[in-house]
Amino acid sequence: MRLYNTMTRTKEEFKPLKDKVVNMYVCGPTVYNYIHIGNARAFIVFDTVRRYLEYKGYTVNYVQNFTDIDDKIINRAKEENTTEKEIAERFIEEYFKDADALGIKRATVHPRATEHIDDIIEFIKILIDKGYAYVVDGNVYFETAKFKDYGKLSHKNIDELMAGARVEIDEKKKNPLDFALWKAQKPGEPAWDSPWGKGRPGWHIECSVMSTKYLGKTLDIHAGGPDLIFPHHENEIAQSEAAYDQPFSKYWMHIGYLNVNNEKMSKSKGNFFTVRELTEKYDPEVLRLFMLMAHYRSPINFSLDLLDQAKSAYERLSNAVVNLKHLANITKDRELSDEEKDLIVKFDEYKKQFEEAMDDDFNTADAISVLFEMAKTANANLSGNSSKKLVEYILEMFLKLSDVLGLSYKNAETEIEDEEILRLIEERQKARKEKNWKLADEIRDKLKERGIILEDTPEGVRWKRIR
């Protein structure tokens, strides 16, 4: 199994530090609003990575934090005349509603920054004691010039970073690239006691503290959105490696950017979509499938037209499941014919192709193509006369591989009940006996409209669902 490591810019053989255990940290949301589709892409992709690792037999310790104190949360609390805690609690709850709808599994731990203030203070003390941080007027800053590898993740040297840094001029800093580990209290803002006076933690330190607390000083995988490479992940590396003198993470994974109608998503352009507003109109699994139909590192363009295409694609998969479930109910248990044994071999090959796609840097786009091939082959070769063993084997495999992608087809329902189909077939047979060809054709057409194809054979009428 190989994955692309942002740090080395190459695909590497995946070998976790401990056999069959993966310690994985994903940067979670700042909880001041509903999550948007850019957030959702990251959470869906890394949930899928986790699911595939579990499918392969790994135990995955999956930690995803909540940033529950931040300027955006403070501003929203002021706007609504409420507390930061109330805003954070509300949007953590809303996050879980969206995540559950999208089939995103709960993390092993969902730590919150405000519950780790003591740990953060202890971590900052280590950095001060080792000479990597300095205190000015109740603020504590990390001194980037002291960390010789600063810029190694974004592949930039300090001079390049300085030239491109859009940093507020802060007279307190020794260097514009230095960043706050602890921020002195401002009037009206929440604050905690510390050796440097009342204040609150900086954003970057929170992730270093929470990831290492729950997963150890070196992680297997650290993952997030492309906008986090610099400065957030770069700063996490600097803090963590300065504190512990060992690599912070073995592998770094980042998704590609998501644009809307070929433009960067922004509220001012009116092309901003939250997960909530889309899942009110579309099955959440359609949005999930859309996100996985492109390779996770590729940029992705979002539009409602493209989402409609994903909806049609999802319906093809969903209808295959409906058809397979129906056949599992009506077929008889008997030994497999030679043709059916060949089909088993063919589906085992599909499973291998699916795994090969996922083993190659989690290529969900190719894996989904395999599911479509499976659906097509099942629809073309299975009927009410197939062996129950064969149908159940294919159904179980299809659902298991779909589950790796987080697709359960839970809303897939049979559009027409089996009893109704059999009743109409009987009616048609009666019409044929009476040579009432017009009525017989009308019944056939009526069933076809509802996704049922009839086939007249010497053994009798066979039927199957096509959607």
Swiss-Prot record:
What Gene Ontology terms for biological process does this UniProt record contain? Answer: cysteinyl-tRNA aminoacylation
- InterPro entries in the record: Cys-tRNA-ligase, Cys-tRNA-synt_Ia_DALR, Cys-tRNA/MSH_ligase, CysS_C, Rossmann-like_a/b/a_fold, tRNA-synt_1_cat_dom, tRNAsynth_Ia_anticodon-bd
What is the protein name for this chain? Cysteine--tRNA ligase
Q: Which cofactor does it need?
A: Zn(2+)
HAMAP family linked: Cys_tRNA_synth
Which segment of this protein is annotated as the motif 'HIGH' region?
Answer: 29-39
Stated EC number for the protein is 6.1.1.16
- Pfam families, from UniProt? CysS_C, DALR_2, tRNA-synt_1e
Any one of the GO CC terms: cytosol
- In this chain, ATP is annotated as bound at K267
Spell out the family assignment given in the record's similarity comment. Belongs to the class-I aminoacyl-tRNA synthetase family.
Keywords, sorted A to Z:
Aminoacyl-tRNA synthetase, ATP-binding, Cytoplasm, Ligase, Metal-binding, Nucleotide-binding, Protein biosynthesis, Zinc
* Short sequence motif named 'KMSKS' region, residue ranges: 264-268
Q: How is the cofactor bound?
A: Binds 1 zinc ion per subunit.
Q: How does it assemble?
A: Monomer.
Q: Where in the cell is it found?
A: Cytoplasm
SUPFAM superfamilies under this entry?
Answer: Anticodon-binding domain of a subclass of class I aminoacyl-tRNA synthetases, Nucleotidylyl transferase
The UniProt catalytic activity note for this protein reads:
tRNA(Cys) + L-cysteine + ATP = L-cysteinyl-tRNA(Cys) + AMP + diphosphate
Q: Where do the annotations place Zn(2+) binding?
A: C27, C207, H232, E236
* A single GO molecular function term of this UniProt record: zinc ion binding
Q: Which organism is it from?
A: Caldanaerobacter subterraneus subsp. tengcongensis (strain DSM 15242 / JCM 11007 / NBRC 100824 / MB4) (Thermoanaerobacter tengcongensis)
